[in-house]
């Protein structure tokens, strides 16, 4: 199985571990970063749709992009999913498995393996640059990433565990992905007092990270083994959903 997980906007500035691999699209990321570094703070704030404070932080990051110390991607992000993935406490065996089976989706680097070296940055799907042929960045990546993802899954067992988000599906020709490989997308719901099921963003992100950790620690081989996942009251509900969308309910 191959696993897909989204990156996070919040990033650590340092990591204790050194990366062991280079991003597949490092040269593309370099070109994008160089163009971002040519903008002033106001232009960055507009492109990234963020505050002046965040724009200033990332203006500095892009100016230091080529010389900043790299850290492994899986240890660089600090969003909700990554807080529950707790990558810093994974064993060497789990990290070795992750390096072969986990892809991290990313608007700047495209696709990352967990131990690829990256530097702190911020990038949004709507950014358009000369380097992207003036296309929004998610459209720019589509032709580059679709075959990479499909080929990596086919070279494994033909199954993709989709724990990324809908926003990052636009990095790929997602219709083609679903036609050529088997996509399993776990869904996480909280049962309301009236019995209705509701997806809550914070819980969904937390569970995605925790499920990645579960897969890595147990080195799962089949999607059926996901049924053993339980976390913070979420349990597999076999009576709900279908095989492609296993439901986990709290």
Indicate residue ranges for each PLM-predicted region:
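Short hydrophobic beta-strand segments
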Residues: 2-6, 159-162
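Internal, well-folded beta-alpha domain core
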Residues: 87-242, 247-250
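Active-site helix-to-loop segments that bind/position phosphate- or nucleotide-bearing substrates
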Residues: 4-89
């Amino acid at each position: 199985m191959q696993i897909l997980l989204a990156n996070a906007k919040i990033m650590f500035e340092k990591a204790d571990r050194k990366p062991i691999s280079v991003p597949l699209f490092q040269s593309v990321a370099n070109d994008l970063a160089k163009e971002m570094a040519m903008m002033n703070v106001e232009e960055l704030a507009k492109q990234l749709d963020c505050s002046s404070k965040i724009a200033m932080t990332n203006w500095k990051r892009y100016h230091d992009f080529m010389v900043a110390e790299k850290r492994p991607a899986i240890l660089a992000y600090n969003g909700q999913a990554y807080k529950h993935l707790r990558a810093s406490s994974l064993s060497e065996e789990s990290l070795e498995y992750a390096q072969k089976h986990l892809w991290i989706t990313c608007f700047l680097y495209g696709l990352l393996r967990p131990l690829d070296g990256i530097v702190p940055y911020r990038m949004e799907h709507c950014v358009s640059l000369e380097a992207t042929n003036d296309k929004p960045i998610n459209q720019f990546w589509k032709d580059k990433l679709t075959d990479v993802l499909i080929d990596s899954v086919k070279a494994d067992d033909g199954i993709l565990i989709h724990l990324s988000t809908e926003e990052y599906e636009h990095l790929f020709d997602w219709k083609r992905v679903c036609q050529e490989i088997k996509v399993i997308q776990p869904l996480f719901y909280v049962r309301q007092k009236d019995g209705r099921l509701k997806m809550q963003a914070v819980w969904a992100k937390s569970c995605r990270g925790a499920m990645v950790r579960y897969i890595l620690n147990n080195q799962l081989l089949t999607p059926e083994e996901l049924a053993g996942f339980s976390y913070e009251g979420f349990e597999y509900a076999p009576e709900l959903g279908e095989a492609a969308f296993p439901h986990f309910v709290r």
